[in-house]
Amino acid sequence: MAKKVFKRLEKLFSKIQNDKAYGVEQGVEVVKSLASAKFDETVEVALRLGVDPRHADQMVRGAVVLPHGTGKKVRVAVFAKDIKQDEAKNAGADVVGGDDLAEEIKNGRIDFDMVIATPDMMAVVGKVGRILGPKGLMPNPKTGTVTMDIAKAVSNAKSGQVNFRVDKKGNVHAPIGKASFPEEKIKENMLELVKTINRLKPSSAKGKYIRNAALSLTMSPSVSLDAQELMDIK
């Protein structure tokens, strides 16, 4: 078994020039050629940013609606009340509630990928913050998931909204599609993501903003990208 895995990886590595930082177009082409799993692998971008997340003014966080989605069916939960619950249901939310939903979450219900809430429901959401937070599900105004425009937020989530946040080491990871996507769709999704991250560059960040960049599939080695080309995307 180990020998098979080694041979598979060896074959994949042979397709990559390790000392080369690929341009976006060629990088996408190479990463698609690495698809070898028996399922439709996710394409992921990893960026190392020149920020220090220990400083609040250098925390890069936001959301982007990818033009071609992620290829994943997203289940959305909404905390709202009265007419806003109706708006959520009409927009296609999978789970809608208030205190009752918070109780279900306390009892172990986590069958959704994104949580949206109206501002007046954040006190209720706060009761399950210790459960949602570590899973990256806590609603936040910066990602458009705390809003009165519930219909738009649900629509964005269903259309392929990706929420991202720099980690403690300055890295951002985000899915931008599936291996089965045409190259052009993966490229356009990546450009939209990078454009959004570039717009969020903190004014206090010094030096090179995107230090390193890579593209990979769920089961593949990573392909290095030209960080300067990505920084030039506006």
UniProtKB/Swiss-Prot annotation:
Keywords: Antibiotic, Antimicrobial, Repressor, Ribonucleoprotein, Ribosomal protein, RNA-binding, rRNA-binding, Translation regulation, tRNA-binding. One of its GO terms (biological process) is regulation of translation. GO terms for cellular component: cytosolic large ribosomal subunit. The keyword Transcription does not apply. One of its GO terms (molecular function) is structural constituent of ribosome. The keyword Cell inner membrane does not apply. Gene3D superfamilies: 3.30.190.20, 3.40.50.790. Disulfide bonds: none annotated. Belongs to the universal ribosomal protein uL1 family. NCBIfam families: rplA_bact (TIGR01169). Part of the 50S ribosomal subunit. Binds directly to 23S rRNA. The L1 stalk is quite mobile in the ribosome, and is involved in E site tRNA release. The antimicrobial peptide HP (2-20) forms a short alpha-helix. Increasing the amphiphilicity of the helix increases its antimicrobial activities. This is Large ribosomal subunit protein uL1. The gene is rplA.
